[in-house]
């Protein structure tokens, strides 16, 4: 749920800075569970995501076939494991996929094409989101502006001396 909230706030930050959000690469988002979607709806974040999406899953009208081609937009997929697990939906052969999933084994999410090796890159949620908007990896200045006001982690290293 935290990553979905980060995404919603980043979209608001980018719009505030640039006036609009335009994707230069596809961003495929699959919420972990329906319960999380319900919570995001109650908290107002789902409306933010829908505002910027070009596709929102609809259980009353499920898509018939797995998607094999993607446009440069935000896809709000059915909760669960879609592209993240390399199930039926995969990127086109030879594409470069940047994802937050650790299950990026060679050929699982993207296969090689005759012209180019398919690449799977592991990254953080903010870097993935901003990269799809920019069409490239962000500079540090762009990253800092996009995550302004977002608590990315509550982790804090121990201040105790661990080794004497």
Kindly label every feature range from the protein language model:
Residues 1-164:
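Fe-S-dependent hydro-lyases/dehydratases of central metabolism
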């Amino acid at each position: 749920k935290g990553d979905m909230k980060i995404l919603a706030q980043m979209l608001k930050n980018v719009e505030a800075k640039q006036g609009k959000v335009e994707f230069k690469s596809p961003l495929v988002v699959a919420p972990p569970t329906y319960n999380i979607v319900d919570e995001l709806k109650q908290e107002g974040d789902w409306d933010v995501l829908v505002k910027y999406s070009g596709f929102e899953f609809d259980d009353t009208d499920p898509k018939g076939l797995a998607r094999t081609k993607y446009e440069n937009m935000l896809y709000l997929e059915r909760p669960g494991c879609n592209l993240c697990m390399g199930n039926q939906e995969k990127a086109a052969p030879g594409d470069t996929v940047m994802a937050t999933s650790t299950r990026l084994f060679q050929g699982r999410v993207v296969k090689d094409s005759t012209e180019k090796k398919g690449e799977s890159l592991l990254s953080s949620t903010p870097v993935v989101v901003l990269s799809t908007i920019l069409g490239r990896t962000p500079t540090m200045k762009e990253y800092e502006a996009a995550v302004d006001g977002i608590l990315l982690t509550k982790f804090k290293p121990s201040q105790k001396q661990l080794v004497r």
